């Protein structure tokens, strides 16, 4: 039977609950426990699939095709465990499910209310993850901040949850902020005291406090927090600002987070094996020469919009003992100036996914610059589509080529809508989503990188390479190095006589892990290193 850990946050938003939950998952897994982590998000959207990246950051796609919060990416990367659509719950999806049940008559004419129906549905979702994953420990992160109106149904649900299980089957962790007042030279505990008071008023007594701070917390402060918040002093956990999110599990291990959590769950504190993780941090802190990577996108004002891409680059650099020197380049700025202005000094170029017209011509110019100047290049999803358009216009003698998404009237739609998408009306959850197989072509860079005949990658798209133009592309020097098993969909393309030029229709960034970088990102960094070595 599963045990349950609930992670709440107080004082401020973006306090780091997701990293704490993911780090605890890593620590538990290092002790031999199986873990699944879910996120309860308090917004009314059914999922983040149609939300602006500027507001929400990236949409993380699970194996089974769910469009989820970016925190699920942290969960997967830290625990190396695949999550499913069950691991992402929003207020919108809860209300949708309850209203659908009411319309079907499931409540037998009863009055449908927040308590018990909404809170009951939330509890059922948590139990469903436990039943589906069969994990030893289920960690649940509650989005938002204690005191927010939006989070109240979730907090009430996790309060009720302790009545569903034995008391030693559940633990509550509260992540909070201890601000340092520079003028007085003091760390203040009052905001945390009030946050815990608010949590208690709901009926939840936290078992552990994880205290975010940029200054070390002494024993006197821990004792004060213990007394005012009703938490054992050993369960007051210091969480200092870290040089990398990947070093957080090690610092929380040192503070005893996992040990104390297991104590509340009445589980054995097994021997912890973090040798590989410690080696990862050693490599991260002792890199070799820098690699200047330009990420050419349209949402660069918010780095979280490309979170998994950045982490995948970081994983590859750690593996290759390189220092990631990331250059954020606005595709629109390239449109207004020139690619050379922004890309002349970089060692590699990445064009990630996206939607819509804005910035597309800048991306195409960046790809042309990478191709002509032999700069290692990797295109992802829309990045592949832009690479196809660039080749069609500048090499394959189709100067008016485009995508039917960008120009519905283009005479040469080298990228077109997938046939199964033609009658789709709704935007949310209707794309080609989740894991699909890709058969690799022999004697290609792609095949050599993966060293597999068939790979499985995550997708999120409506548009695809138009096979009507396949032969003209092949005749002009393009190589198709990966397709769907039936050969209908082009998944991976590359160029010969180039240090590294690959583009894929899928999203490899979602499968990259610290210590296990994705082959396409590792290949990009290695090619950049090789090119630098040759030039020196």
Swiss-Prot record:
The keyword Chaperone does not apply. Pathway: Pyrimidine metabolism; CTP biosynthesis via de novo pathway; CTP from UDP: step 2/2. Its EC number is 6.3.4.2. It catalyses: UTP + L-glutamine + ATP + H2O = CTP + L-glutamate + ADP + phosphate + 2 H(+); L-glutamine + H2O = L-glutamate + NH4(+); UTP + NH4(+) + ATP = CTP + ADP + phosphate + 2 H(+). Mg(2+) binds at residues 71, 141. It is an enzyme of class 6 (ligase). Pfam families: CTP_synth_N, GATase. One of its GO terms (biological process) is pyrimidine nucleobase biosynthetic process. ATP binds at residues 14-19, 71. CDD domains: CTPS_N, GATase1_CTP_Synthase. CTP binds at residues 13, 148-150, 188-193, 224. UTP binds at residues 13, 188-193, 224. GO terms for cellular component: cytosol. PROSITE patterns: GATASE_TYPE_1 (PS51273). GO terms for molecular function: ATP binding; CTP synthase activity; glutaminase activity; identical protein binding; metal ion binding. HAMAP family: PyrG. Homotetramer. This is CTP synthase. It comes from Prochlorococcus marinus (strain AS9601).
């Amino acid at each position: 039977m599963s045990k349950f850990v609930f992670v709440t946050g107080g004082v401020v938003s973006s306090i780091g609950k997701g990293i704490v939950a993911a780090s605890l998952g890593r620590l538990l897994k290092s002790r031999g426990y199986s873990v699944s982590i879910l996120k309860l998000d308090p917004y009314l959207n059914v999922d983040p699939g149609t939300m602006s990246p500027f507001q929400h950051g990236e949409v993380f796609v699970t194996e089974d095709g769910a469009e989820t919060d970016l925190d699920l990416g942290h969960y997967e990367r830290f625990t190396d465990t695949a999550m499913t659509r069950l691991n992402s719950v929003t207020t919108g999806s809860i209300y949708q499910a309850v209203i659908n049940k009411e319309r079907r008559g499931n409540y037998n004419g009863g009055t449908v209310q927040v308590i018990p129906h909404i809170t009951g549905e939330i509890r059922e979702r948590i139990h469903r993850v436990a039943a589906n994953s069969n994990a030893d420990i289920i960690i649940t992160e509650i989005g938002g901040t204690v005191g927010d109106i939006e989070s109240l149904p979730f907090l009430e649900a996790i309060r009720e949850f302790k009545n569903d299980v034995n008391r030693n089957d559940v633990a509550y962790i509260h992540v909070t902020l201890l601000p340092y007042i520079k003028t007085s030279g003091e760390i203040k505990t009052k905001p945390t005291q009030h946050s815990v008071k608010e949590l208690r008023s709901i009926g939840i007594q936290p078992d552990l406090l994880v205290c975010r701070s940029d200054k070390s917390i002494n024993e006197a402060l821990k004792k004060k927090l213990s007394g005012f918040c009703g938490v054992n002093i050993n369960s007051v956990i210091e969480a200092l600002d870290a040089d990398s999110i990947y070093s957080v599990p090690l610092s929380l291990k040192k503070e005893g987070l996992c040990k104390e959590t297991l104590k509340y769950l009445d589980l054995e504190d097994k021997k912890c094996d973090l040798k590989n993780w410690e080696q990862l941090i050693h490599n991260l802190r002792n890199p070799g020469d820098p690699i200047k990577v330009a990420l050419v996108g349209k949402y660069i004002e918010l780095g979280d919009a490309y979170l998994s891409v950045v982490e995948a680059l970081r994983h590859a650099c750690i593996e290759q003992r390189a220092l990631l020197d990331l250059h954020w380049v606005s595709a629109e700025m390239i449109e207004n100036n020139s690619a050379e202005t922004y890309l002349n000094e970089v060692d590699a170029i990445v064009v990630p996914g996206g939607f819509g017209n804005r910035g597309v011509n800048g991306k195409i110019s960046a790809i042309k610059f990478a191709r002509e100047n032999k700069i290692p290049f990797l295109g992802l999803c829309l990045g592949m589509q832009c690479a196809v358009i660039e080749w069609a216009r500048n090499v394959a003698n189709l100067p008016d080529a485009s995508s039917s998404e960008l120009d519905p009237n283009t005479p040469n739609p080298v990228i077109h809508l997938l046939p199964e998408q033609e009658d789709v009306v709704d935007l949310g959850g209707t794309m080609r989503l989740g894991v699909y197989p890709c058969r690799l072509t022999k004697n290609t860079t792609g095949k050599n990188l993966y060293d597999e005949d068939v790979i499985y990658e995550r997708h999120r798209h409506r548009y695809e390479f138009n096979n009507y133009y396949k032969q003209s592309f092949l005749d002009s020097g393009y190589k198709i190095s990966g397709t769907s098993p039936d050969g209908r969909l082009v998944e991976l393309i590359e160029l010969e006589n180039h240090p590294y030029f690959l583009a894929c229709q899928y999203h490899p960034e979602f499968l990259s892990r610290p210590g296990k970088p994705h082959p396409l990102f590792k290949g990009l960094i290695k090619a950049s290193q090789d090119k630098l070595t040759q030039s020196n």
